[in-house]
Amino acid sequence: MPGTSELITVAVPKGRLLQESSALFERALGVSPRKLLEGTRKLAADAPEAGLRFISIRAGDVASYVEHGAAEVGIVGLDVLREEPRDLYEPLDLGIGRCTVIVARPKGARPLPRGVAPRVATKYLSLAARHFAAKGVPAEIIPLHGSIEVAPSLGLADTIVDITETGETLRANGLVIEEKVLEVSARLVVNRVALKLHPERLRRLIEALRAAVAEAGAEAR
């Protein structure tokens, strides 16, 4: 059994992904980060029987923790990875946290006059800019971090780029999806230095999770 200093640190995001990823870890290794972390004020919990330490942090920060070596492994949405590319090894699509980054406009909105740059409200500054640039559209990107769906109704933007799971919030705000930008799911990411320092232990972790993902997928079919 590894000592405390030898545990592999896994950064798991708070919220829905913590619950979904916990099911995979429980299936793969018999440990649940959600169960270990719940009922405590601490943001870290050890599972020495699996050789792991789990830390619970904000979803948008997981990639930074792993890239800079504060955690060896993490779970990150593909939207985060494509918005701000990182020097990380991405060995596995976990098949959880499925959503779509989309372009949406008010239902029944008239097309903008030719030559008029659309005002696009979004938290995905890079993804949105690349998407419209690829279409040859000189969009004005308006950075927002919340309540993006109301921007068109308040006259702040003509269009939004946002992430959605069911589209219900979009419909409730009178918006319709025009395009899909990126299909999103959570990915397992690994620090590249850690991969050289602990190749066998990380390989076993990756393969155990890979088998759990395949098993969960087979059951869902």
From Swiss-Prot:
Its EC number is 2.4.2.17. GO terms for biological process: L-histidine biosynthetic process. Signal peptide: none annotated. It is an enzyme of class 2 (transferase). Gene3D superfamilies: Periplasmic binding protein-like II. GO terms for cellular component: cytoplasm. Keywords: Amino-acid biosynthesis, ATP-binding, Cytoplasm, Glycosyltransferase, Histidine biosynthesis, Nucleotide-binding, Transferase. PROSITE patterns: ATP_P_PHORIBOSYLTR. It is found in: Cytoplasm. It catalyses: 1-(5-phospho-beta-D-ribosyl)-ATP + diphosphate = 5-phospho-alpha-D-ribose 1-diphosphate + ATP. Pathway: Amino-acid biosynthesis; L-histidine biosynthesis; L-histidine from 5-phospho-alpha-D-ribose 1-diphosphate: step 1/9. Its main location: cytoplasm. GO terms for molecular function: ATP binding; ATP phosphoribosyltransferase activity. Heteromultimer composed of HisG and HisZ subunits. Catalyzes the condensation of ATP and 5-phosphoribose 1-diphosphate to form N'-(5'-phosphoribosyl)-ATP (PR-ATP). Has a crucial role in the pathway because the rate of histidine biosynthesis seems to be controlled primarily by regulation of HisG enzymatic activity. Belongs to the ATP phosphoribosyltransferase family. Short subfamily. Lacks the C-terminal regulatory region which is replaced by HisZ. This is ATP phosphoribosyltransferase. It comes from Anaeromyxobacter dehalogenans (strain 2CP-1 / ATCC BAA-258). The gene is hisG.
